[in-house]
Amino acid sequence: MNGHHQQNGVENMMLFEVVKMGKSAMQSVVDDWIEAYKHSKDVALLDLINFFIQCSGCKGVVSGEMFRHMQNSEIIRRMTEEFDEDSGDYPLTMAGPQWKKFKFSFCEFIGVLVRQCQYSIIYDEYMMDTVISLLTGLSDSQVRAFRHTSTLAAMKLMTALVNVALNLSINMDNTQRQYEAERNKMIGKRANDRLELLLQKRKELQENQDEIENMMNAIFKGVFVHRYRDAIAEIRAICIEEIGVWMKMYSDAFLNDSYLKYVGWTMHDKQGEVRLKCLTALQGLYYNRELNTKLELFTSRFKDRIVSMTLDKEYDVAVQAIKLLTLVLQSSDEVLTAEDCENVYHLVYSAHRPVAVAAGEFLYKKLFSCRDPEEDGIMKRRGRLSPNANLVKTLVFFFLESELHEHAAYLVDSMWDCATELLKDWDCMNSLLLDDPLNGEEALTDRQESALIEILLCTVRQAAECHPPVGRGTGKRVLTAKEKKSQMDDKTHLTELFAVSLPQLLAKYSVDAEKVTNLLQLPQYFDLEIYTTGRLEKHLEALLRQIRNIVEKHTDTDVLEACSKTYHALCNEEFTIYNRVDIAKSQLIDELADKFNRLLEDFLQEEEELDEDDAYQVLSTLKRITAFHNAHDLSRWDLFSGNYKLLKTGIENGDMPEQIVVHALQCTHYVILWQLAKFSETGSSKEELITLKRQMRVFCQICQHYLTNVNTAVKEQAFTILCDVLMIFSHQIVVGGREALEPLVYSPDSSLQSELLSFILDHVFIDQDDDNSSSDGQQDDEASKIEALHKRRNLLAAFCKLIVYNVVEMNTAADIFKQYMRYYNDYGDIIKETMSKTRQIDKIQCAKTLILSLQQLFNEMIQEHSYNFDRSSPTFSAIKELARRFALTFGLDQLKTREAIAMLHKDGIEFAFKEPSPQGEAHPPLNMAFLDILSEFSSKLLRQDKKTVYAYLERFMTFQMSLRREDVWLPLMSYRNSLLAGGDDDTMSVMSGMSGRGSSTRSKKIKPPTGKRKLPEAEESSSSDSMWLNREQTMNTPVMLQTPQLTSTIMREPKRLRPEESYMPVYPMQPEHHQPSLDYNTQVTWMLAQRQQEEAARQQQERAAMNYVKLRSNLQHAIRRNTGLMEDDEEPIVEDVMMSSEGRIEDLNEGMDFDTMDIDLPPSKNRRERTELKPDFFDPASIMDESVLGVSMF
């Protein structure tokens, strides 16, 4: 028996190793097994059974004795016991190159086995029955490895059988035709023997087909019906993938509603990979137009689901859903309604490029691929007469209808792969813009011409840069040789075309700012060498003349900056046209500078009210100079002095037009930045550095003056520039080997920091209704609100950058942090990122800033409600909630934030006991309620740190305080409670139950610390702050240093203390133990000595006090917070969320024949009853039912 067992092991190992290594001799191995089967069925089948067991990762071996005398269920139970419970890996899930090929080889083995057996032993009613019975039993196992491997084997076995059934069907049809042909012959020519042979062959084929159908029914009913809704997504995906193959391979038998319903139901699966398999399976069906008639009912029932899947949370699923709809569209134009198509159209503007590209292909198939046969004769025509002319117009109409006029680049990129020829037909677009319309042709409207120019610019950019627009894609990639050649050809073609036509286009649309702005960007993508090689210098001269005319005509900032960038693109020293362009640019700036100085001199000499015409002339000239200074170094024109005079006069007189001040500030900013850039690149003399330093500081003073201007635009411009200048000239300026610029380092004084912070508080943290920039129309009003919010976010980000880079004091961030909850929707991401960055710089200082922000809010509440506020009030609850959110930002690693959390508690305790009650010691300190807020951070303390903080808290408490049980002392009791809880206990404060967020009873017991503090004599007189630490702890709590109270520009004290009270950092001691004010370390030593003397009495009294606290706390409900909208401060928890809501698949059977075909063969007697494992709820909703899917591994 042992020898036989060993022989089986060797044979089995050979099969498994062949499959694992993926050898090409798979057919010969199968043939050898077939020969072994013909010689000894049981031995060969035992080898095959052990092969499946080993492929499942099981170390057990089925012996001959087990095979002969045990039922399948008993064998599987025995094999389950042989599993290695310490590892959940098995061949189908193992990592490594050899296992990646295993699945393919495993599936190939099963397919080859059936193919080689299809004319012989497959019909012996033993081999296939045994294999199917085994796989059915294994697929019903609670062991995932058995279930996964056997389901894959069964599904591949079914696929192979479907192929056999298809061949049998074809042979039957051929035999039937031969029989009919022979029978229809004349009696004299008819061969009766042949008729008998054909009848016998048809009968054999029919019997074989019946046998194969029985096998398929057994697999389908025994495996598929139960496993397509398995708890494991991979198993469900296998089932759906294979049923798609069956329907495509043998559509006559499987492509009907009885099988399609499983795919339709599973499109609601909660896992994206399963939904993806549904879509790919359907794509294979819809691709074959001959099958469309069989899909009509399915399409009508599940079309809405497919359309909704274009918005799937998994982008891969959304892409395949769009591709499937494209195939549906090609099969029939009438299936998809206009609303269905519109749901796909808008996805061309998606930021996810694969989704957008798929939507672009759908759009192209729907709107652009239908060509009139009459156009075949004009295919070679170009320009306005080309067949693309109407398609270009259609594209323009679609772009305008979508009402997303700022996203033409996204539209072009979406269609770039499928409509390249159309989008690169620049001759057609150029002709539509320049040429007159033909007879009977309707001319483009002004709005359509603007859209066409914008699309034209985007196509030129896409062809020249060869990468998606900003916000779509991962960035630039290395181009292939073919792509580089295409890029060069495109740049050559567009340069040859637009170098000639661009001056004409600019002349035609010179008065239209929007059109001109887009057209002026075209030269940025030119191959400038063609101006010389193509002898196009005269067209360059025409272009420069048009640009000069546009500069003289327009004062719009966008137009002027486009002109400036065009000069910058053309002024490339690598090309021979540089001198010509540079001369034209210099002449233009000379005229502008002279005109500005002349106008400025006259303008500043006007003593009476400023003349509007003169002001307009000054403003228009200043706007032109500022636009050019943005892209060009105009230092040699000495623009600083003129702008300085203008700004200084505006400060002195106070009546300077706002736009003049705004552009003068911007122009002066450019002057300073260009000077700094030149010094950084080429170096500078000491005198030049001194001059720049003086100019920079004078300019900062001017900006600081304008922060208090009455005009909002001026204040915002001054603030933005100030933040930029302070950032640029901070200590960072010397980084990277620029030590020579150290004299330029400028740090803002406290007054400037206060003004910057005040600006943020007054202009950023405001309600939308307070912003006076809204318009009259509802749509314009909404757009203006969004624009105003975007502007305020930029202002806040500029100031937060100063905090992050330590340009301003970190404690100024307290006024920002305290707005976190109130303005979470508008600025939550900015404030949270600022917290994160400041914590990286200095954890302790960041923690002190957070507690300072809570103290400020607490003081503001006291000012508004006095000290008799209700701790269940919304204001106090909001502060507690903010504290909880702050605590969440510290993360889960308590060791990293240990020192910061300890310092936070120290500052909080000092603040709570800072103000003694004027009614005497029988009443709590005025800020005692702050301990309720501080308790939100207790869960972030380590166990030993809780004991240390508790000891520090006791220093501020009198003996009578520990005995107080009135409600006004609840914050102290709650805070002590949180410190005495276990190290891992996330105990919340007692009063949290009044905050309205729901409550739950905690069962954790509160234990007082049992360790006694004992200090060596040598340390009793030490001045180290660590004397207050518990020496029995294995880890030392961070030192709590005495620090001054942080203040801020708007922090208001509710009450001014007497000098002697404000000096004392702790609550007054008992009268009999009263001591003069001591330093921090002396107090620690004194307190420890007093505790050693009174230890016995205090322990007894504290036991009584703690027993009361425990009793009271057990009667209170600790809050278990409900997860809210903004719980993302914690580590994200990834969940599998069902795409469709429950009940969406109701009445799916209505109108469809969903009766599964009957099984002719009875279930195998070796198969375990399924009711023992789980109920057989054959309902589409059972896919979403966790009770049905809840199959554990063991």
UniProtKB/Swiss-Prot annotation:
Residues 224-309 form the SCD domain. Keywords: Cell cycle, Cell division, Centromere, Chromosome, Chromosome partition, Mitosis, Nucleus, Phosphoprotein. Residues 986-1027 are annotated as: Disordered. One of its GO terms (biological process) is sister chromatid cohesion. It is found in: Nucleus; Chromosome; Chromosome, Centromere. Residues 988-1001 have a biased composition (Low complexity). SUPFAM superfamilies: ARM repeat (SSF48371). Phosphorylated by PLK1. The large dissociation of cohesin from chromosome arms during prophase is partly due to its phosphorylation. GO terms for cellular component: chromatin; chromosome, centromeric region; cohesin complex; nucleus. PROSITE patterns: SCD (PS51425). Residues 1002-1013 have a biased composition (Basic residues). Transmembrane segments: none annotated. One of its GO terms (molecular function) is chromatin binding. Part of the cohesin complex which is composed of a heterodimer between a SMC1 protein (SMC1A or SMC1B) and SMC3, which are attached via their hinge domain, and RAD21 which link them at their heads, and one STAG protein (STAG1, STAG2 or STAG3). In cohesin complexes, STAG2 is mutually exclusive with STAG1 and STAG3. Interacts directly with RAD21 in cohesin complex. Belongs to the SCC3 family. Component of cohesin complex, a complex required for the cohesion of sister chromatids after DNA replication. The cohesin complex apparently forms a large proteinaceous ring within which sister chromatids can be trapped. At anaphase, the complex is cleaved and dissociates from chromatin, allowing sister chromatids to segregate. The cohesin complex may also play a role in spindle pole assembly during mitosis. This is Cohesin subunit SA-2. It comes from Xenopus laevis (African clawed frog). The lineage of its organism: Eukaryota, Metazoa, Chordata, Craniata, Vertebrata. The gene is stag2.
